[in-house]
Amino acid sequence: MHRGIAIYPGSFDPPTNGHLDLIGRGAKIFEQLVVAILRNSEKSPMFTVGERIEMLHSLTAEMENVRIDTFNGLTVEYAKSLDATCILRGIRAISDYEYELQMALMNRKLEPTLETVFMMPADKYSYVSSRLVREVAQAGGPVRGLVPEVVEEKLREKLDPAYKLRDARMLEFMEPGTGISPERKERKRKKKA
C-alpha cells in the first residue's frame, strides 16, 4: 500500500460501477482515498450534491480508508488542503487520455509535488459513463449492471415517469390477466413439449 492520501475527484452524477471499481482498487493502493465531489455551479446535475454524497457513503461503507467529501475551485488547491500526494483519474478511451493528460500537465505546473495516477476500469465498465447512464435512464432504458443497485433505485425514483412509460409499453405486449408476453408463453409451451 502506498503511504499517503489520494483524491478521486469527479461529479459522480450518478456514481457508476466504473466509479466503484476505481474506488475499490484505489483504496487498496493508497492509505486514504478521498472521493471528492466537485461542486460545479455551471452544470445542472441530475442528483443534488447531498444525494450523491448519500449514494457514495452507502457504496463505500465497508471501505474503511475511503472518505467522501465535496469541493469547489481548483483540484490542486483542494488536494493541497488535504496534504494529498496524488490525484486518481479513470481513463476509458483515448479521448479520455488526451483530456486527462492536459489536466495532469496543468496540475503538475500548478503543483509539481502532486502526482496524477491514471487507472483503467475493468473491461466490462470501459464504456460506462455517468452521462450515458443518465441518457439511458431518462429514456426509460435499463441501467442494471451499469450502476450499483442503490443508484438504480435512486434513478428510478428520480425518473419515475420514464420508468412508468417503459412498464406501460411492456404491458401492451402481455396477455390480459397473465402478466406474460405471448413470446414467453410460446417458449414455455415449447419447453413442455
What are these regions (language model features)?
Residues M1-A193:
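Nucleotidyltransferase catalytic core that binds NTPs
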